[in-house]
Amino acid sequence: MSRAFAPYSREEGAIVFVGRKRNPVEPIVSVKDLVKRYGSAVALDHFTLEIAPGEIFGLLGPNGSGKTTAINCILQLLTYDRGEICLFGQPMTQTRYDLKRRIGIVPQNIAVFEELSVQQNIDYFCSLYVSDAAERKQLVKRAIEFVGLEDYTRARPKKLSGGLLRRLNIACGIAHRPELIFLDEPTVAVDPQSRASILDGIKQMNAEGSTIVYTSHYMEEVEEICTRIMIMDKGHTLACGTNEELKALVAAGEKIIIEADVSEAALIKLRSLPHALRVEYESGRLEVVCENAEHNVADVLDALSAARIKPGRIWAEPPTLNDVFLEITGRELRD
């Protein structure tokens, strides 16, 4: 059920939204008031989040927003200036190897050994968590099948395409069947077929019981697979909630799209409509984003009719996460 959102706090211009209290399940990830500085630059500014067991939790934001820094701090790969981090209900420190064994990490940069084969790479990373050779053999076999690398077990990484390398990177991080998996931009620079395969695999891992933390600047991916989403920018949390909760935050309603030859005078008229938030026109395609209102389409068509413009095909699209980001920050997600 969708829950209403209310402003939580403002910190140096940041806007944080939180939902009303959810089910009292102990979070698998809890971060409170995390601050990370590089000299005078603030990478994370009082960053806070909670992730429940079984979620696919998305961290969405442009490059440089603080997503990777947040993950590295949570995993104790980076020191931080202040804050509290708990995993599985226990304080996380650099020496909590018992907690680290329950975690899988898939970094943004490919982290495999060039001199080892696909199978040897997966076996090596799995051995960091599983000492029993017989058990590890089965886990490695399952990981290879899971990512679809059965035909490449003896291949060296340099012989693999970008998409296959990404699959190997994932297999190395999840072979030991972790309860909590962090995936940092796992689909960067891969072809559409490999991207679809990776997203399907993430859904399957979640269905089998793993909690997923997924960072990306690809809005459509996060929108497709994540049960809850946090939007970040410049080290701040801007908004957090389900897909529908986030869209309910924005004043924008549906986007009206019309194929027509539109004059500059007509565009001026459209931009003056009381509910129009954004009007864009290029190559015969008119897009009008309006506030939620009952008569938006009629008002747009009336304005075109008054300018003696005959519209062609007309359709509407619901608001997207990019609309949420644009309204909160005033810029496109990928600027």
Briefly describe each language-model feature range.
Residues 115, 156-163:
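Conserved ABC ATPase signature
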Residues 181-185:
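Catalytic Walker B motif of ABC-type/P-loop ATPase nucleotide-binding domains
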Residues 83-91, 98-99:
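Conserved ABC transporter NBD signature motif
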Residues 170:
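Hydrophobic anchor residue at the start of the ABC signature
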